[in-house]
Amino acid sequence: MTVQKLVEPQGLSTKTVYKYFTDKEDLLKQCLFIHYSELSQKFNAFEKGSSNPVITICKFWHEAIKLDFGATHIFYHDLNYYYPKLQDSVINKIFRRNPLVLKNLIEKGIRLKYFRNELEPVIIIEVMGLLYTSITRTDKFKKIRLSPAIILQNTIDLYIRGLCTEKGLRELNLYYSSIIK
């Protein structure tokens, strides 16, 4: 899509857009920065309102999948396919500015005995990110032809179960039984 096609419905000229943005990628970068900043704020608020880190982490990944494959899935598909490095740079910049919410949740889960105490939060975050990236940015799971939610249940959800103590597993089972009903 050209910049002209982007701005025409808004009644803007391309000259106006180029006054503020060097090119289409710069415009997309600024839009992504606003978008992911808003998502980060929502997640921070979501995390603060939760007393159970295991459930909060599960909800986070389920919401992310809904976003990537929901009403705007074509946008995210194209973004993941054509601009993965741009998307990564924006996400990394935003998460460097904000506290590492996921790391804090994992540490809280360890303290509250939801997660096993020998775990390393930094490694857990990396693995979850790799699993999520393999679901959203590769063709690895397309040939299976299952919904993204089912794929998530068989990857990240299973990984989270492996991190849990008996207490954490009880909470997860209660949570899953409540959302399946």
Give the predicted meaning of each segment.
Residues 67-88, 103-104, 172, 176:
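Amphipathic alpha-helical segments used for helix-helix packing
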Residues 86-114, 122-137:
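Amphipathic alpha-helical packing segments from all-alpha helical-bundle domains
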Residues 104-108, 112, 142-181:
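C-terminal peripheral helix-coil segments that are non-catalytic and often amphipathic
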